[in-house]
């Protein structure tokens, strides 16, 4: 199995539920076609470098996965036929050096995803209550 990274940009006009639905669709497509998702990174809504189809913003999402080369062909086909995807890219990591870089990126993304969950929650501080002023006669 080869190492891949894909990033796609979803139209900003979709509702948050529709965006999650699109993301899950592509994650399921990777799994259904024999791929193994190693990490995902939700980059959120960002400004585009230039306007694409009259959109100045887009919702970015990155998936790191391992699969056979045939999956990439199917994934690109699914990206192309969906009008809600503004842009996409699939990057293949071939050499040992590139695969080590891929492993490092996957580790960073997984650590970043775990960090907020393990952080202790601080108790909110209460402001001191000021004594009420009594009216003078």
UniProtKB/Swiss-Prot annotation:
Family annotation (Pfam families): Ribosomal_S6
Keywords per UniProt: Ribonucleoprotein, Ribosomal protein, RNA-binding, rRNA-binding
GO BP term, pick one: translation
GO cellular component, one term: cytosolic small ribosomal subunit
Annotated stretches, region: Disordered: 113-137
Gene3D superfamilies per UniProt: 3.30.70.60
A GO molecular function held by the record: structural constituent of ribosome
Stored InterPro entries: Ribosomal_bS6 (IPR000529), Ribosomal_bS6_CS (IPR020815), Ribosomal_bS6_sf (IPR035980), Ribosomal_S6_plastid/chlpt (IPR020814), Transl_elong_EF1B/ribsomal_bS6 (IPR014717)
Domain of life: Bacteria
Biased composition (Low complexity): 119-137
Family: Belongs to the bacterial ribosomal protein bS6 family.
Described function: Binds together with bS18 to 16S ribosomal RNA.
Protein name, entry field: Small ribosomal subunit protein bS6
The species this protein was found in: Wolinella succinogenes (strain ATCC 29543 / DSM 1740 / CCUG 13145 / JCM 31913 / LMG 7466 / NCTC 11488 / FDC 602W) (Vibrio succinogenes)
């Amino acid at each position: 199995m080869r190492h891949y990274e894909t990033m796609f940009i979803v139209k900003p006009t979709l509702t948050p539920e529709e965006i999650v639905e699109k993301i899950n669709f592509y994650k399921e497509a990777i799994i259904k076609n024999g791929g193994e998702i190693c990490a995902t990174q939700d980059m959120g809504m960002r400004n585009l470098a230039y306007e694409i189809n009259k959109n100045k913003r887009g919702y970015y999402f990155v998936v790191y996965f391992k699969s056979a080369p045939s999956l990439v062909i199917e994934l690109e086909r699914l990206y192309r036929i969906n009008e809600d995807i503004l842009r996409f890219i699939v990057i293949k990591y071939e050499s040992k050096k590139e695969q080590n870089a891929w492993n490092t990126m996957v580790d960073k993304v997984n650590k970043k995803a775990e960090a907020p969950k393990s952080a202790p929650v601080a108790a909110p501080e209460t402001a001191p209550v000021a004594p009420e002023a009594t009216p003078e006669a």
